[in-house]
Regions:
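Intrinsically disordered, low-complexity segments enriched in small/polar residues
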Residues: 12, 29, 41, 57-58, ...
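Soluble, cytosolic/nucleoplasmic coiled-coil alpha-helices used as oligomeric scaffolds and tethers
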Residues: 29, 36, 84-87, 91-94, ...
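Heptad-repeat amphipathic alpha-helical coiled-coil interaction surface used
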Residues: 9-12, 16-19, 23, 44, ...
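Short, charge/polar-rich alpha-helical segments
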Residues: 1-37
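Acidic, low-complexity, intrinsically disordered interaction modules
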Residues: 36-70
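Short, positively charged, Ser/Thr-rich terminal linear motifs in low-complexity/disordered regions
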Residues: 6-8, 18, 31, 61, ...
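Short intrinsically disordered terminal tails
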Residues: 1-7, 89-104
Length: 104
């Protein structure tokens, strides 16, 4: 069964929020600032509430095409963000593990 368009958009919004929370949790636990890649991708994936609302509420053929294009691009962007967060987490944990050299 295929999700209706606004459910796909809502799902992507939730996925982005979960990724952002994961990055925040890593930063809080390790004290390591976001990598430039994570910071950039969080910025690129941000949409203001009005934009999310417009994507889910609009109707018609043009809106359907716009949503389909958005979903395709946004999934790719979120996959890149997830990979960047995984690298950030690995780097942060390695940097803050016992025995790791600390910079003054």
């Amino acid at each position: 069964m295929t999700a209706i368009p606004h459910q796909r958009i809502t799902s992507l919004k939730g996925q982005r929020q979960a990724l952002q929370q994961r990055a925040r949790t890593i930063r809080a636990a390790t004290g390591t600032p976001y990598s430039s890649e994570v910071h950039l991708l969080l910025g690129q994936s941000y949409l203001d509430p009005a934009s999310w609302q417009e994507l889910t509420a609009s109707g018609g053929v043009r809106a359907a095409v716009r949503r389909a294009q958005f979903v395709r691009r946004y999934r790719h962007l979120l996959a890149r963000l997830e990979a960047a967060i995984e690298r950030y987490e690995q780097h942060s944990v390695a940097q803050n593990s016992p025995g790791a050299e600390r910079m003054p």
